[in-house]
Structure formats: C-alpha cells, structure tokens
C-alpha cells in the first residue's frame, strides 16, 4: 500500500577481512535490491535511499529513511521495473517504468502518480531511462 511505513532493524557486523563495519539495512527474509548504479538513488543530503523490495509479494519502490530506520512504500501493484527508477535532482519525484509501457513520475510528497510517456503498442520500454544531472532531459530505450 502506497505510503505504508515499514519499520526496519538495521543489523551491524564487522567484516572479517577488512575490519570495517557492515550495515544490513533491509530484513534478511525479504528480497530487496538497489537500482542501477548510474541512477540517482540517494537524496542530496544522503539521508534517504531508493530501493526495490518485495515486501508485498511483488516488486515495488521504497524510500529508506536511513536515520529513522524505516522505509516508505512509493508504488504498489505488479509491473514495476525496480532496477531503472531514479530520484529527480530536486528529490521531489521518483521516475520509473510500469508494465514495460509507461514512464511514470511519483510525487514523493503526495504519492500521486502521473503517466509521463506511454510507449506505442509495437514497442516495449526496456525500463532504463536515464536523466541528465538536473533532470531536464531523459533518454529511454525502446525495443
């Protein structure tokens, strides 16, 4: 459910090889992953992290409040491409592909969703849309 807050209990351990502290932020019994490394997944102040998780049985987007150790569900239902989404430069929106057809924008304050672009019926949106640094231009792949 959009807006649902999921409390998390970070687990900390020391890496046996390096001696560095390693923090697991998501529960071991839920499959979670980050988006592609070149997409903007941290807020500008580095306090929040965008990730994909299967808390509700299908992949959806979540925004992890690192200091608060909780995640807020941003999208719902099946069909989210949880690898190619990204946060806008101003940290006010999530951009992602739904059902391989629609580029969507989610307002992070209201959680309202807008279809920004829909792929023609003869094509499939591959799911990887990349923005320039200030999110004024996007490039997408259609196959």
What does each of the following model-derived ranges do?
Residues 1-23:
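Blade/loop signatures of beta-propeller domains
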Residues 5, 54-59, 96-100, 143:
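Short, solvent-exposed loop/turn segments at conserved positions within beta-propeller repeat blades
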Residues 14-18, 44, 48-77:
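Beta-propeller domains
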Residues 20, 37, 58, 82, ...:
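Short coil/loop residues immediately preceding or within conserved phosphate-binding loops
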Residues 23-31, 70-76, 112-120:
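A short beta-strand motif characteristic of beta-propeller blades
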Residues 33-42:
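Signature of short aromatic-glycine-proline-rich micro-motifs recurring in repeat-based ectodomains
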Residues 39, 60-62, 102:
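Conserved beta-strand and immediately adjacent loop positions that scaffold enzyme active sites
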Residues 79-88, 92-143:
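Asp-box/WD-like beta-propeller blade repeats and closely related beta-sheet repeat scaffolds
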